[in-house]
Amino acid sequence: MGTVHRRLSDRAWDGVAAQPYDDAPGGVERHELIGRADGAPHYRVRYFHVPAGSRTALERHAHDHGVVIERGRARVTLGDDEHEVGAGDVVYVAGDELHCFEALGDEPLGFICVAPPA
């Protein structure tokens, strides 16, 4: 059976708790919007909130994932390359690719990430 999580504010959804992203500096939050708890065995959809001036951890995973920038601007590291992106831009992160999302400017960064379950 499907699930609906209604958006309550710019970074809150009904029935979805914010989770600290311990590997990242500066108060980054994750929100699992769709996952195993919702009956989704093959993928998960998460929202990341990155405060202005902060970033996600520089990391790599075996799986690939897709990212949609929802708000703010970011410097995205993909392997040895860096790209500036903004709201509406889409990023593909290949499996085992070193990556990081850094909020630029005075506005927080918000993005949706779709990936296989951990």
Give a label for each model feature:
Residues 1-42:
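A short, N-terminal "cap"/entry segment at the start of jelly-roll beta-barrel domains
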Residues 30-32, 46-61, 95:
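Conserved short histidine dyad/triad with adjacent acidic residue
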Residues 47, 66, 81-83:
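Short, surface-exposed secondary-structure edge patches
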Residues 47, 92, 106-118:
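A short hydrophobic beta-strand segment most commonly corresponding to one strand
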Residues 54, 62-63, 81, 97, ...:
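A generic "binding-loop/recognition-motif" signal
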Residues 54-57, 75, 91, 95-101:
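Histidine-centered metal-chelating micro-motifs
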Residues 63-74:
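Glycine- and acidic-residue-biased ligand/ion/polar-headgroup-sensing regions
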Residues 81-95:
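Short acidic-glycine-tyrosine-enriched beta hairpin
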